[in-house]
Amino acid sequence: MMTIQRYSLVFCAIFATCWTASVVNNKQVIDTSVPQTETTLNDADFHSDLHQRYDLQTLGIKVKDDPTIGNYSEGDILLESPKKFVEENNKLGRNAIKQIYRRWPNNEIPYTLSSQYGSYARSVIANAMNEYHTKTCVKFVARDPSKHHDYLWIHPDEGCYSLVGKTGGKQPVSLDSGCIQVGTIVHELMHAVGFFHEQSRQDRDSYIDVVWQNVMNGADDQFEKYNLNVISHLDEPYDYASIMHYGPYAFSGSGKKTLVPKKSGSERMGQRVKFSDIDVRKINKLYNCPGVSGNNNNNNNNQINSNSIVNHPQV
């Protein structure tokens, strides 16, 4: 028995393939004792095996699969309210604000990362960025202060949130310990790329009913719709499986459903596991990505694995 264990340890040391849940600790997620400075990811983060799904709840971390932060517009968008966003953009003459606030130039999104993220969090964030790198032409690049004035500042504030599109300067994206999951990070970064939530579409009432009596007090504005002067559907159908869609219990004040689908194909509504095919196509259309894999119509938009089953969010 000891011989088997010895050989196993040697194999792990040589091939670095034996990352187990037992070696994850809270400081490998976020270590607030570290002075907060701006860093970037390195090659080791992008090639690490540490991103493999880990149950953060075993560390006492409250996981935020579907954040419902009442102080933010639509739960995780850093705006005062959807209405204010529309009013501000009306003042701008409704200038090409279709589905994005501002598009990032050259399909590159510069970023910096808080030094408080540990090795596990860094690998998960890198894996989420890799989803964009392999399926779209959008690239997250380490900020070069000499040429990047506008950039994302990814740090552990309170909850998970992002602004929509490029807003200028040092632009915050918050990923606290409960947000360190690949799907949740992909979702927040998709806001930064330029997308609102799927159920904000003008045509959403043809696909879902909002059960207003089940919505928590003061949260009605979390279900605002944007008209086509503000967002574009990019000629894509409504997507229940989008990583940008709310789950059925979002902002529930009673534990009952707030969103009820009207059509079939909604089994994974609210999933936070991976892009749907339509998500990928929309990003590629928005950024004019040429010949990027993932633009095919292989009719598997709703084929998300069993880990994506949506549970009642903590509200």
From Swiss-Prot:
Highest taxon listed in the record's lineage: Eukaryota
Active site: 188
Keyword Glycoprotein attributed: yes
GO biological process, one term: proteolysis
Entry keyword Transmembrane helix: no
Cell compartment(s), UniProt: Secreted
Keywords: Disulfide bond, Glycoprotein, Hydrolase, Metal-binding, Metalloprotease, Protease, Secreted, Signal, Zinc, Zymogen
Cofactors that this protein relies on: Zn(2+)
Glycan-carrying positions: 71
Protein name: Zinc metalloproteinase nas-4
Tissue expression notes: Digestive tract. Found in the pharynx cells of the procorpus, metacorpus, isthmus and terminal bulb, and in the terminal bulb lumen.
EC number: 3.4.24.-
SUPFAM superfamilies linked: Metalloproteases ('zincins'), catalytic domain
Annotated segments matching region Disordered: 291-315
GO molecular function, one term: zinc ion binding
InterPro entries the record matches: Astacin-like_dom (IPR034035), MetalloPept_cat_dom_sf (IPR024079), Peptidase_M12A (IPR001506), Peptidase_Metallo (IPR006026)
Pfam family, one: Astacin
Cofactor binding notes: Binds 1 zinc ion per subunit.
Function, in words: Metalloprotease. May be involved in digestion.
